[in-house]
């Protein structure tokens, strides 16, 4: 992993794979291997610059170390999973002496001509990893009369992607889901989702995110990548319709993604100000893991994705031999805790003209033995050719992993938080056992080194035309002196402006030279290498940092602390990435060197969208300042400002493939189509909500539009423009409004001179005028036609307000259509919808006088109702069934959270119990050699009543897995409760029968997540549990289900009160909060009237058949009669909010005024009962 900051400096964050493949152990240097100092590093770099010809010619210099460097762990990047500072030693074993490496900073991530003085070592403190914190959530369905509302988005839709081959639209919603829709004719006519009037049908909902899905893109390999405010990036296989990887490396919301199709890399960024670049060919490797406890090699291929994700319950294992990665001109050898890195610097930024003369003569003499299973390369055997990649896919990326890299774990001790188990550390890359040195060496000799020579020999080998282009760009470094007003001259209050400008000036010439050289070389390669289909891809990957070889990623900060990145664009070959942020500036980063190469200033507010053309020479940016700017990347200046289109923030841009038109939309709800050649603009649509995303579909000349509402629209553009023509000015009633003068006459003349060799000749012709004109729509003009949408995908209302009622089982909600609904979370469904009524009045109407402790949390941020359970909070509420609206034959005390868990995992309990019984009977079968007895025991044990041998074994199993946490029986000085004590001898089915008070719908979604990492570990419906899911790692859940042990004691929440009877001295008592007033009446009846001299409060067995005390007595607090179902907690919360003892008074009801007769009657009843 690499990290670079606003200063342009780089540091390396190496990662270590332990014996089980987990990135959790520090990489300590070998005690016997000395660690080089920094002075030697500088000397080595100088020697490399001065004596590179000799180094290239001498391939026998195998023991020479290049620019060895000690690296230390970044404590801020805690998601790497390291626990202590690291000092890996980086050695070069002459594996990469093929190519000239002048001016190359051999520090990990170098390659941009930097020196070791630019490298910063960080001595940081250890990282303390937090233990996993599990959370169980379940959905409450928005159903009425058992009719499920169609699966549609609620709230806004942040992003869109389109599969042109299959005509499938993917939408990323603020409801945490990604939904796919078949547009027009599909490949599955038997789909249960019927098409509607617009000719589309719903296909699939991807639900693994837990917060807003902010962006997504789709590539040609049917891989969908999404990012979310839950700080994760998820890789989806749209063919199997499941998540194959979850990347949790951002520290905050991930807001934007950018994809480079030629390199198959993508960039991500967000509110943590980091830019990370990933190798999608490695990230998208399917990780289908088994959750079968009895078969670790069985991969679950269920479309419901019934598995603990790809990173949670499983650990990444490697072989005892440490892996060696060889990709993108880098060898990474992990041996005995040391990392040895040999980097081959195909430095495109080299300024020395004499360093590449002997490149074609340099080849490695060593041989590489690649083993399919171990992928281990011995240092003594040499390495592969420097230009070789490990197993090439269609994009030229090699990314084959060895088999059996993952397995299950069965207990919490082996669990490792998902952030450290990701498949983005140095991993086993192979070419399936084939030795590819010969072919790669030939390519290197014949073609690839020619490209290296062309890239490096700017002064000697480029033709005249290329030199002209270089001169054009080089002169732009000093365009301030030529009368041009550089955008960087605008005022900016950033503290790092001076450093940024210096860094940009240092790297600008290098970037411009390389950019032109790459264009020249690409043309050269087409002529010289037409017979080699893989050569272009190989050359493409040679210029990247060696991080991609290990499946790692690039990390950079844009603007320093407190800067949030909202927009991102990457060149199609991933050569550089551009970011826009709250810094109000556009920063460009060279992926090859990891350094900032330019900074474009001009916007006055947050930059919300950035687009690059195909050859990365032009850039469009949209900002919250209401403007759209067109930039020249080579000249690093703004060449046009579109400031008269929108009246508010511009949030999204879209363009066609030729970059001749662009669409813009924003907070004002207006969508404009602008011609970049003629600067003519036309209004396409006016929405009622702010525009979040515009997706241009050139296949049918339409655009997809999403807004802050939940509706997605498609507008046809056949009446607006031909994709091959400019906007028809004759049919567009536009008023010509002059734009702001960006440049004076001298500037325009200079611009024309400097842009002679650029690809935008039409733009240069327009610059002949003294000032550029921008034609925009006059909204009041006649003839303006705004078309109705061709397709409309309706959304649904989402919950925006909720209130948990006092009974802690019902929730009142209000959606964005102002509809008020009542939900019962113990039933898992909607009870009633009241329509558009006053929320507060309904709340007052349904909120009863009752107090039950909080035991769950409500999550409505995605528009749907989810209930979250965490330990020990979920076990905090005990209540009698009558207080929960139930009508049981016996009013027993239950723990609400425990009963909900039994309902959620009822299918798991049944399946797990049968598996355990089956395993036990199989053991008995081996001992008794009797198949008949086994069959009979299996049939009889289905109900869990027979086979003592099985139960004995089951007892031992439970005792071994019990953590010692037992459920406390509730007790007080008044009454003993019916609390269930755990009995490990009973099978789980028998326990479930008594504990399953609530019955949730079988289609209720159950989600298990780790709050520490923010990843979803498991998602399933109740009916889909099999009993093989490894929930043992959640100890509090497993103990609750198996032994009824909960990590909280009921007796620790007692309330003090006193009872005064017949104006006698009050009796001071205390009892748990859940004791009802009727229990106090029973206490008064028994202890003051029937057995006044009996001090033993445990008389319930004697007086069960006697009348209830509530028939004769009433309990009062300050002359207010308390209802029998009130609990002490209710009395304390509503009627006595002081911290002192509650003074209660017991009095005989009015119909029993003669207290003496009442006493005689009660005593007679007691005597008759005792005689019986």
UniProtKB/Swiss-Prot annotation:
Annotated GO MF terms: ubiquitin binding
Ranges of compositional bias, category Polar residues: 13-36, 64-89, 366-377, 388-408, 417-434
Family label: Belongs to the WD repeat WDR48 family.
Biased segments, Low complexity type: 37-63, 90-107, 341-365, 435-485, 514-543, 745-769, 930-984
Repeat region (WD), residues: 152-202, 208-246, 249-548, 560-599, 602-641, 645-683, 686-727, 794-833
Species this chain originates from: Dictyostelium discoideum
Classification via PANTHER family: WD REPEAT-CONTAINING PROTEIN 48 (PTHR19862:SF14)
GO biological process entries: double-strand break repair via homologous recombination
Biased composition, class Acidic residues, residue ranges: 486-503
Protein name: WD repeat-containing protein 48 homolog
């Amino acid at each position: 992993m690499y990290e670079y900051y606003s200063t342009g400096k780089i540091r390396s964050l190496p990662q270590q794979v332990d014996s089980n493949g987990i990135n959790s152990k520090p990489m300590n240097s070998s005690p016997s291997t000395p660690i080089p100092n920094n002075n030697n590093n500088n000397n080595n770099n100088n020697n490399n610059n001065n004596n590179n010809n000799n180094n290239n010619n001498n391939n026998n210099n195998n023991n020479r170390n290049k620019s060895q460097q000690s690296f230390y762990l970044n404590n801020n990047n805690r998601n790497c999973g390291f626990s202590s500072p690291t000092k890996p030693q980086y050695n070069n074993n002459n594996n990469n002496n093929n190519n000239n490496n002048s001016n190359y900073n051999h520090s990990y991530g170098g390659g941009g001509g930097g020196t070791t003085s630019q490298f910063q070592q960080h001595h940081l403190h250890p990282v303390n990893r937090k233990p996993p914190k599990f959370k169980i959530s379940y959905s409450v369905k928005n159903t009425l009369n058992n009719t499920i509302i169609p699966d549609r988005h609620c709230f806004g839709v942040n992003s869109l992607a389109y599969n042109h081959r299959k005509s499938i639209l993917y939408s990323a919603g603020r409801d945490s889901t990604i939904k796919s829709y078949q547009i027009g004719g599909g490949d599955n006519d038997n789909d249960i989702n019927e098409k509607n009037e617009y000719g589309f049908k719903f296909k699939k909902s991807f639900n693994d995110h837990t917060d807003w899905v902010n962006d997504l893109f789709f590539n040609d390999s049917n891989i969908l990548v999404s990012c979310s405010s839950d700080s994760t990036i998820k890789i989806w296989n749209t063919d199997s319709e499941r998540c194959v990887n979850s990347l949790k490396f951002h520290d905050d919301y991930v807001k934007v993604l950018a994809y480079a199709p030629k390199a198959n890399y993508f960039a991500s960024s967000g509110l943590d100000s980091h830019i990370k670049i990933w190798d999608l060919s490695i990230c998208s490797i399917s990780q289908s893991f088994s959750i079968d406890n009895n078969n670790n090699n069985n991969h679950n291929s269920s479309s419901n994705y019934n598995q603990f994700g790809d990173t949670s319950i499983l650990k990444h294992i490697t072989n005892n031999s440490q892996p060696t990665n060889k990709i993108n001109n880098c060898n990474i050898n992990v041996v005995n805790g040391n990392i040895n890195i040999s980097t081959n610097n195909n430095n495109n930024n080299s300024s020395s003209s004499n360093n590449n003369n002997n490149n074609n003569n340099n080849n490695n003499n060593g041989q590489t033995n690649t083993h399919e299973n171990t992928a281990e390369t011995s240092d003594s055997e040499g390495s592969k050719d420097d230009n070789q990649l490990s197993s090439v896919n269609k994009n030229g990326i090699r990314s084959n992993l060895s088999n059996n890299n993952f397995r299950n774990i069965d207990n919490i001790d082996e669990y490792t938080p998902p952030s450290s188990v990701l498949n983005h550390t140095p991993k086993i890359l192979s070419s399936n056992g084939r030795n590819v040195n010969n072919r790669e060496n030939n390519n290197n000799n014949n073609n690839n080194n020619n490209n290296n020579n062309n890239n490096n020999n700017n002064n000697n080998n480029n033709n005249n035309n290329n030199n002209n282009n270089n001169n054009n760009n080089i002169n732009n470094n000093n365009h301030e002196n030529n009368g041009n007003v550089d955008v960087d001259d605008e005022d900016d209050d950033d503290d790092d402006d001076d450093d940024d400008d210096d860094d940009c000036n240092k790297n600008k010439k290098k970037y411009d030279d390389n950019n032109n050289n790459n264009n020249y070389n690409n043309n050269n390669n087409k002529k010289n290498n037409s017979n080699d289909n893989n050569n272009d891809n190989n050359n493409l990957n040679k210029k990247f940092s060696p991080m991609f070889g290990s499946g790692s990623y690039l990390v950079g900060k844009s603007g320093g602390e407190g800067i949030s990145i909202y927009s991102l664009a990457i060149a199609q070959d991933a050569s550089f990435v551009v970011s826009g942020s709250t810094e109000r500036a556009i920063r460009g980063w060279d992926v090859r060197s990891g350094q900032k190469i330019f900074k474009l200033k001009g916007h006055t507010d947050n930059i919300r969208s950035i687009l690059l053309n195909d050859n990365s020479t032009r850039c469009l940016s949209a900002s919250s300042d209401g403007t759209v700017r067109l930039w020249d990347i080579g000249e690093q200046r703004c060449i046009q400002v579109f400031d008269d289109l929108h009246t508010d923030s511009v949030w999204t841009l879209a363009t066609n493939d030729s970059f001749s038109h662009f669409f813009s939309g924003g907070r004002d709800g207006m969508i404009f189509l602008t011609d970049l050649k003629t600067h003519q603009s036309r209004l396409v649509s006016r929405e009622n909500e702010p525009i979040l995303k515009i997706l241009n579909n050139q296949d049918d000349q339409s655009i997809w539009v999403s807004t802050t509402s939940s509706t997605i629209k498609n507008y046809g553009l056949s009446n607006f423009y031909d994709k091959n023509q400019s906007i028809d000015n004759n049919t567009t009633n536009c008023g010509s409004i002059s734009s702001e003068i960006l440049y004076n006459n001298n500037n325009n003349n200079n611009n024309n001179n400097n842009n002679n060799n650029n690809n935008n000749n039409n733009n240069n012709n327009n610059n002949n005028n003294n000032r550029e004109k921008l034609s925009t729509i006059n909204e009041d003009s006649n003839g303006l036609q705004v078309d109705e949408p061709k397709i409309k995908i309706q959304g649904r209302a989402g919950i925006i307000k909720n209130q948990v009622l006092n009974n802690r089982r019902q929730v009142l909600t209000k959606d964005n259509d102002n509809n008020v609904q009542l939900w019962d979370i113990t039933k898992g469904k909607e009870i009633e919808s009241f329509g558009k009524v006053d929320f507060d009045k309904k709340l007052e109407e349904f909120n009863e006088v009752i107090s039950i402790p909080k035991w769950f949390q409500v999550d409505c941020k995605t528009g749907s109702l989810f209930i979250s359970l965490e330990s020990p909070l979920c076990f905090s509420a005990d209540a009698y069934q009558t207080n929960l609206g139930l009508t049981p034959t016996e009013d027993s005390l239950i723990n609400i959270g425990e009963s909900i868990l039994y309902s959620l995992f009822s299918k798991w309990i049944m399946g797990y119990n049968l598996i355990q019984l089956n395993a036990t009977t199989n053991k008995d079968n081996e001992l008794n050699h009797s198949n008949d007895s086994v069959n009979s025991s299996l049939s009889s044990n289905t109900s869990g009543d027979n086979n003592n041998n099985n139960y004995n074994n089951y007892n031992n199993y439970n005792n071994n897995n019990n953590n010692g946490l037992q459920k406390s029986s509730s007790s007080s000085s008044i009454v003993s409760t019916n609390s269930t004590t755990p009995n490990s001898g009973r099978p789980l089915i028998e326990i479930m029968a008594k504990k399953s008070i609530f019955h949730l719908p079988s289609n209720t979604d159950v989600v298990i997540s780790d709050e520490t990492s923010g990843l979803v570990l498991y998602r399933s419906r109740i009916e889909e549990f099999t009993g093989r899911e490894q929930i043992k790692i959640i100890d509090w859940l497993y103990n609750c289900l198996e032994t009824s042990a909960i990590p909280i004691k009921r007796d620790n929440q007692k309330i003090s009160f006193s009872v005064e009877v017949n104006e006698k001295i009050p009796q001071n008592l205390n009892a748990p909060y859940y004791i009802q007033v009727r229990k106090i009446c029973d206490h008064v009846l028994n202890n003051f009237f029937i057995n006044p001299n009996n001090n033993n409060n445990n008389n319930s067995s004697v007086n069960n058949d006697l009348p209830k005390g509530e028939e004769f007595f009433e309990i009062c607090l300050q002359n207010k009669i308390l209802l029998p179902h009130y609990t002490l907690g209710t009395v304390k919360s509503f009627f006595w909010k002081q911290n002192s003892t509650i003074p209660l008074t017991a009095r005989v009801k009015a119909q029993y005024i003669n207290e003496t007769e009442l006493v005689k009657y009660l005593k007679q009843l007691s005597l008759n009962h005792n005689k019986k």
